C-alpha cells in the first residue's frame, strides 16, 4: 500500500507541474501578443510634406539629386563622377564602372558568369587566375599557381 501511495503522489506532482507550466506559457504568450500589438500600433509612420534642411539645401543649388539615374540625357555625368582615366559609362540609363561591374564588365550588358568577377574590365575566376588570385589585381609570383584563390596552395 505504501508503494502505491508513493507512485500516486509522484504522478499527482507531475500533473500539477505540467498544468502550471501550460498556464505559464499561455499567459506569457498572451502578454507577448498584446505587447506586439501595442508596439505595432505605436510605430505607425507619420510623414509630413517637409523636406529636411540637407535635401532642401541641395535642391536650392540646382543640383539634380537623381542625376546618376538619368545619364542618357547627359553623357558627361558619368565621366564627371570618375577621375581622368575613368572607366565610368552610361549603361541602361545608369552610371556604372565598366572595370568592376559584374553586369557590365568591359562593355554595357557584358555579364560575367556566376562564379566570375569583373577585374579591369574582364571576367575572371578569382580562384584560378594568376593575375587576380583571390581578389582583383593580386598577382602570384613567377612560377606560382593560383589554386582556390591562394598563390602556391599546397
Curated annotation (Swiss-Prot):
Key words of the record: Signal
Signal peptide bounds: 1-23
Any Pfam family hit: Stig1
InterPro entries listed in its UniProt record: Stig-like
Highest taxon, organism lineage: Eukaryota
Family assignment from sequence similarity: Belongs to the STIG1 family.
Protein name (record): Stigma-specific STIG1-like protein 3
Species annotation: Arabidopsis thaliana (Mouse-ear cress)
Amino acid at each position: 500500500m505504501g508503494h502505491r501511495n508513493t507512485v500516486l503522489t509522484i504522478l499527482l506532482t507531475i500533473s500539477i507541474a505540467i498544468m502550471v507550466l501550460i498556464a505559464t506559457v499561455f499567459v506569457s504568450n498572451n502578454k507577448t501578443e498584446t505587447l506586439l500589438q501595442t508596439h505595432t500600433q505605436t510605430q505607425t509612420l507619420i510623414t509630413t510634406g517637409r523636406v529636411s534642411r540637407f535635401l532642401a539645401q541641395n535642391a536650392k543649388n540646382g543640383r539634380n539629386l537623381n542625376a546618376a539615374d538619368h545619364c542618357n540625357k547627359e553623357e558627361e555625368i558619368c565621366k564627371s563622377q570618375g577621375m581622368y582615366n575613368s572607366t565610368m559609362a552610361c549603361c541602361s540609363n545608369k552610371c556604372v564602372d565598366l572595370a568592376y561591374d559584374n553586369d557590365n564588365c568591359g562593355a554595357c550588358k557584358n555579364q560575367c558568369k556566376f562564379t566570375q568577377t569583373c577585374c579591369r574590365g574582364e571576367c575572371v575566376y578569382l580562384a584560378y587566375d594568376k593575375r587576380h588570385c583571390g581578389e582583383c589585381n593580386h598577382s602570384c609570383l613567377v612560377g606560382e599557381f593560383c589554386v582556390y584563390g591562394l598563390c602556391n596552395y599546397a
